[in-house]
Amino acid sequence: MDVTLRPWVTDDAAALRLAAATSPDLSSQLGDTDLGTIDACEGFIDRQLRRRPPLGQDLAIAVDGRVAGNVGLSNVDRQHDTAWVYYWVAMEFRGRGLATCALATMSVWAFDYWELFRLELGHRLNNPASCAVARGAGFGAEGVERAKLRYGDQRFDVETHARLATDPAPSVRLLPTVAVA
């Protein structure tokens, strides 16, 4: 299995459409955007996933050339050298450790290239798989924010995690990263 991180391209629209159609839990992570057509997916890629420094960066997780997910960095705060990180993996690619490796790789890149000191993320308490990704990538739990997220009429508690540049590196494989600006 050849896994790389690379920038999103408009040609990834079909893979994004398939991921959204077969992974209904992604709708909240993708902002409840309608991704039912190739045109809609192309627009989403251009507006949301082709972000470039200094605003942030999204990278496609590619498996044997196919888009399997995303790992991203946003809300960069240069005064405090912090940022928010996030990830998702399409249903058919879950359970292979892809998100953990991608998050660990993005973290190293954020510390080295962006010269950030603290990375933060959060996951719903009812998402133990996301918690396992965070912990596996070296992010320690810091606390629970009650009723932080709202999807539809339902509110969710969120566990926050952080990783510092001075924290020990996790024992996971880092992924090759292709042509990141």
Language-model-detected regions and their locations in the chain:
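Acyl-donor (CoA/ACP) binding surface of acyl/acetyltransferases
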Residues: M1-P24, D58-A181
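Conserved GNAT-fold acetyl-CoA-binding loop/helix
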Residues: D25-D46
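A short helix-loop-beta-strand connector motif used in the catalytic cores of GNAT acetyltransferases and
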Residues: R47-A60
